[in-house]
UniProtKB/Swiss-Prot annotation:
This is Orotate phosphoribosyltransferase. Homodimer. GO terms for cellular component: cytoplasm. Catalyzes the transfer of a ribosyl phosphate group from 5-phosphoribose 1-diphosphate to orotate, leading to the formation of orotidine monophosphate (OMP).
Amino acid sequence: MSDHRHRFLQLALTADALRFGQFTLKSGRLSPYFFNAGRFDSGSLLSQLGACYADAIDASGIKYDVVFGPAYKGIPLATAMACELAQRGRDLPLSFNRKEAKDHGEGGQLIGADMQGKRVLIVDDVITAGTAIREALGIIRAAGGTPAGIVVALDRQEIASETDRRSAAQSVAEEAGIPVIAVASLADLLDFASGNPELVGYRQPLEAYRAQYGVRSIR
């Protein structure tokens, strides 16, 4: 496992963003783990998380001109990554959207950099059903931008349904024709649990969950 994947999973565990046990997901599935990016709730945690995102996107080779964070969770994540990239000497424009368009002041739905004619990278926490990401793709195209790729924190690598054996991330990647990468995945989580004495007991439930719902890695 690469260093940034291990650092991210350790950070998520420390922040209580990654929890193990039994959790009922929105899909109704009983999952042995749960990820909540909202737990990265301090300047220090977001700074470290931004570095993990930056490492992942640098390793991917995706070319882009603007960083875009979909409302709401994507906004601090994209901001943290953009700040980290600036520290590394790459100061990129940043844009994000409102859930509701304003009809006063500067107006509109978008805040930040102009995306017209630019390659745009979407930064978010996870892709669950893909609804929010598809909305972001539409917003970028309507603003004259070209979606260049998507980076998320965690890829659960599980099928959407019994009739669609792709994950939500795979579906979005195929439909949009752009790469979807993750800082870490379920496969990484299994490796991480195996190497952590406090988590090794969760490996069997994780393996069973992957056997029932897993898909091939997208990275």
